[in-house]
Amino acid sequence: MAASSLAKFAEIEIDLGRYKGNYSYLKNNDRILPTEEEIIKYYWSIPNPLWQRAFGLMAAYGISNHELFYVDLDSLLEPPGHLISTYRKNHYGIRRIYCLCPEWYKEWELYKHIDLPQVTGQNNRDLGHRVSTAFRRYGLCKPGDLRHCWAIRAMGFIPDSMAARMMAHKTQVHNDTYKRWIDENDEDRFYQLLINRSDRPKPPTV
């Protein structure tokens, strides 16, 4: 692929080739993810400010439905708003997660301290179930969809290993999970990013 060659020349850590092939790793290959426009509409449709904040954090930072309750909200008080998570800290330490749509950090006022919904649960599955139930109640997408969208948004902008760490899983799991969503539109986007770099290879002037 042309985009793969350009990525190599521009020293960007993107290997588009690995996103082709067998997609059987996913349980549901027909899963349709919401567009960013739909995510924004979902956000503004939530009448409960606590659940609106929960949705906003999950959309902006790609955290899972139970990781929501392992984050340090005070870490968002100052820009650029890197979210601190202690989820799976025994494996990955305390992690910083980037908001890849900084406009959401500002427009949704994620820097303001608003409490999360008060939910109960004996384990992560219980906590996640409470979140999933709330999403269904408000007619939203699945919580995992927001996490998938963050991962796809990260492709081409940050190294896969860094994105995987932010999501608290291994790089191979990251690649196997999200490779199926690379399409021609993504390849075209990577191409535009690469050719607009000031340090890209250029032919000599004669």
Residue ranges and their predicted role:
Residues 33, 89-91, 167-192:
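Catalytic-site neighborhood detector that most strongly recognizes the C-terminal catalytic loop/helix
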Residues 99-150, 155:
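Active-site/catalytic core of tyrosine-dependent DNA strand-transfer enzymes
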Residues 76-80, 158-177:
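Short, polar N-cap/turn motifs at the start of nucleic acid-interacting alpha helices
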Residues 105, 112-116, 192-206:
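C-terminal secondary-structure termini that scaffold catalytic or DNA-interacting sites
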Residues 70-107:
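Conserved tyrosine-mediated DNA breakage-rejoining catalytic core shared by Y-recombinases
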Residues 56, 60, 145-169:
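C-terminal catalytic core of tyrosine-transesterase DNA break-rejoin enzymes
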Residues 20-65, 69:
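Basic, Lys/Arg- and aromatic-enriched nucleic-acid-binding interface segment
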Residues 1-20, 63-66:
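N-terminal DNA-binding recognition helix of tyrosine site-specific recombinases/integrases
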